[in-house]
Amino acid sequence: MERSFPSFRTAFAECLTGEADGYVLELPGWAGESLERLEETTVAVFDWYGARSTPRRPAVSREDVTDPSHWFHWGEHRAFVLCFAPCFREDHARYGFGRPETFVMFQHERAFHRRHPQQIPVGVRRAVRRTFDEAGRGYEYDIGAVPTYD
């Protein structure tokens, strides 16, 4: 994680100028080999970055990373977080398409606001859900960074 920190900081700064939409942290597959391990990993990632935030962020819990309304906070930034890991089957919305790695994707709130300043239109939401359904992976909008089931 130490090696990723400079690129994490840079990506979040670039989100403010529109040069980036977020950051993807690639971790070894074992970090997401089971749902329980993925929860532990995500809590550890949030805590590690949070400890390096100004202001310093309080520790998070498993309940935080499974809460669909939870946003990751770092400094003045907020990001919606999704995890893709080997523990998810092909029909799951968080399936990693056969990649052996675990990915933690931080989508900065500015990425949403640039495209849809008020809120994401209903038509866009429907199109996203339809695309997921057509791919056999029903879109699940009520899951947190880590879903509560695999």
Feature names for model-found ranges:
Residues M1-T66:
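Long acidic/polar interaction regions in large eukaryotic complex-forming proteins
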Residues C15-E19, F88, A135-D142:
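Short secondary-structure junctions and interdomain/linker hinges
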Residues Y23, Y49, Y95, Y139-Y141, ...:
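Sequence-level detector for tyrosine residue identity
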Residues L27-W30, F84-P86, E109:
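An acidic- and aromatic-residue-enriched active-site/binding cleft used to recognize and process polar
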Residues G32, F88-D91, H113:
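Eukaryotic short linear interaction motifs
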Residues L38-E40, C87, R94-G96, P117-P121:
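Surface-exposed beta-strand edges and their flanking turn/coil or helix-capping segments
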Residues V60-F106:
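Aromatic/basic-lined ligand-recognition segments
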Residues P100-D150:
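Polybasic, proline/glycine-rich intrinsically disordered low-complexity segments
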